[in-house]
A protein has these predicted regions:
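Cys/His-rich metal-coordination motifs, chiefly Zn-binding "fingers/knuckles"
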Residues: 1-21
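Active-site-proximal flexible loops/turns
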Residues: 9, 104-105, 123, 161
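Low-complexity, intrinsically disordered, cysteine-poor segments enriched in small/polar
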Residues: 33, 37-40, 44, 91, ...
């Protein structure tokens, strides 16, 4: 409740709306971070885009609808075959995956191998945050969050393949033909290889939930942007 009051007041101030919540209504014993930059930063993710025209709202709405439909390709995909992940986005994720390997190379073998996954997950989050910080566009940020969820599902088939090593790898050949792959090494190092299929499925559904949550967030921001545009302007 305390956090909600702080966020509500911050959002109202950003949108020009008055608030009838007095400072003394908020418990003086709340954590200090609720009044600090962290609360202000998080609250920015709850502010709808300002001055979004009707055409822009329609275009964003169509995009979110398409992403909602596309999400089910990955949510319902079989992590044992990876057929659902052999599309355009897999190639995009692969670019940042390989960049992550290079970036983490100085930090030892485990981090070097894990760096591929970290790289492909970090870039969508950077996009999400950049939309909010640089443009105040929470609808655009929701697309970045959707990409993060999709990139997480992109890891799932390789996690599930840690023991079988049947998936084709970059450059040709399967993991069995090329001494394994990233997640074969990572799960064996952590002693989790016997749970590869379970972990792969868990990662897939977690990513799918994030994708749907991102679409819901974007839809909510669009609805609030529409409500703000319909509100009479005080003169």
């Amino acid at each position: 409740m305390q956090c909600g009051l702080v966020f509500s007041k911050w959002i109202d101030a950003r949108s020009g709306r008055s608030t009838d919540v007095d400072d003394d209504e908020v418990d003086a014993g709340r954590p200090a971070w609720l009044d600090g930059p962290v609360a202000g930063f998080l609250a920015r993710f709850m502010v709808p885009p300002q001055s979004m025209g009707k055409a822009s709202r329609i275009a964003h709405g169509l995009l979110l609808t398409a992403l909602f439909c596309y999400s089910w390709t990955f949510i319902l995909g079989d992590v044992r075959t990876a057929d659902a992940w052999n599309g355009f986005l897999h190639g995009v994720n692969l670019v940042f995956h390989e960049a992550g390997h290079l970036f983490m190379m100085p930090f030892g073998r485990f981090m070097h191998v894990l760096g591929g996954t970290l790289g492909q997950l970090a870039m969508p989050l950077v996009v999400c945050i950049a939309f909010v910080v640089s443009r105040g566009d929470t609808v655009g940020a929701s697309v970045g969050l959707w990409w993060f969820g999709q990139s997480l599902t992109d890891c799932a088939p390789y996690i599930a393949d840690a023991r079988k090593l049947d998936l084709q790898l970059l450059g040709g050949g399967t993991g069995a033909e090329r001494d394994g792959h990233d997640w074969e090494y990572l799960l064996n190092t952590l002693g989790l290889a016997p749970y590869d299929l379970l972990l792969g499925s868990l990662v897939k559904y977690t990513g799918g939930a994030i994708m749907l949550l991102a679409v819901a967030w974007g839809g909510w921001m669009l609805w609030r942007a529409q409500a703000d545009s319909a509100r009479p302007v005080d003169i």
